[in-house]
Amino acid sequence: MKKFFILVLFTINISNISLAENLSFTKIVDLKDPWGSSFINNEELIVTEKSGKIKLINLNSKKIFVIQHNLNYLEHGQGGLLDIIYKDDFIYISYTENRGNWKTSTSIAKAKFNKKNLIFENIFQANPPIDSGYHFGSRLVIKDNYLFATAGERNEGMIAQDPTKHPGSIIRIHTDGSIPKDNPKFDGKSDWLPEIYQIGVRNPQGLTLSAFDGKVYLSNHGAKGGDWFGEAKKGENYGWKILGWGGTNYTGTKIGPKWKPGFTKAIQYWVPSIATSAITIYKGKEFSEWNGHALITSLKDQSLRKLIFNDLSNVKEDVIFKNKIGRIRDLQVHPNNGKIYFLGGDSLWLMKKN
C-alpha cells in the first residue's frame, strides 16, 4: 500500500517530551571530523573525514580500512572532504577543491568503487572559485540518473541571487556530469547557468530523496536564526540574502523579511538557530511508526528532531533526543533493518530501540 505525507505550512507545534528513554546508543568506532557516509552493503559503510581520509567501516567487525584517493582537496575552514554516495558500483563525492592561491570550489567527483584506491574524475566544479573557508554546502542525492547537490554561497551573501554563478544554489546534473535538457536554463531561465536547479540558498548541509513522494528536500543554515527545512523546487528562489528567514546578521542587524511572495516558502523554520545538518525522510523497520516523517539533525544543540506531515492544520515537531552523541553531521538508515547510524562528534554511532 502506498504511503503519503502532506506538507503543510500553518501552525507549528513542538513536543517537549523527549523520546530518548526508549532508545539505546552504541559507539561503533572513533573517527576524526567525519562528514559524509553511505552504505556499500548491509555490513559496510563508507565515510569521509573532512581532513582528507576516506574510510570503509565493517559494522560487524568494527575494522576500518583507509581507501587511497587522488582528490586535489584543501582542508580550509569548513571545507575538506564532504559528502559521499555509493550507487551502482560508483562513488560520488563532494569536496573542497584546491583551485590555487587559497581559492577553492565545491566540486563533485566520481570513481569506480574499489576498496584500495579510488581514481576520481571531476563531474562538476562550482564557479567562480572563492578565497573563503565558509559555507561550502554540500550534500548529494541521486534520483534516477540525476545527481542533486547543494552549493553554499561561501559567505558571499548576494551571490546567491546571481544565477550566472554557482555558489548559493542547488545543482542538478546527470550522474555522468552531463546537463539535463529540462533544467531551468532550457525552460524559461535562459540567463541561468545550465547546472543550476534553484537559487537563493545560504549553506545547505542536508539533502534527501523521499521514497514516499519522490521529492527532494533540503535543510539550510540561516545566519543568527533562520535555519529551515524545505523542498527543492525547479527554477525557484529561496531568497537569500534578500530574505533573512526570521534571522538576523551576527551583529544583530536586520537582513530582510522572513518570507514574501515571489520566493519559495520553507516547510519549517528555526529561530533561534539549531544549525540544521543532515536530513532524511525515514523509511525502515526499526522505527516503522516514523515512516514518512522527516528526521532533522542538529549541530548546535546536538539534537535529532522529527517533523510529521500528516495533519492538515499543522506541522508537528518532536525532539527525539539532545546532547547524546555530540554535534550530528550525518545519518544513514540501515537498508535492511532500519536502525540509524550517525556521525556524531568524532565517532560513528548506532541508534536502535531498547
Language-model regions: role of each:
Residues L7, A109, F124, G230, ...:
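Residues in well-ordered beta-strands of folded domains
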Residues A20-G157, G206-H221, P272-N310, H334-K353:
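Acidic, Gly/Ser/Thr-rich repeat motifs that build Ca2+-stabilized beta-propeller blades
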Residues I328-D330:
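Repeated scaffold domains used in trafficking and secretory/extracellular systems
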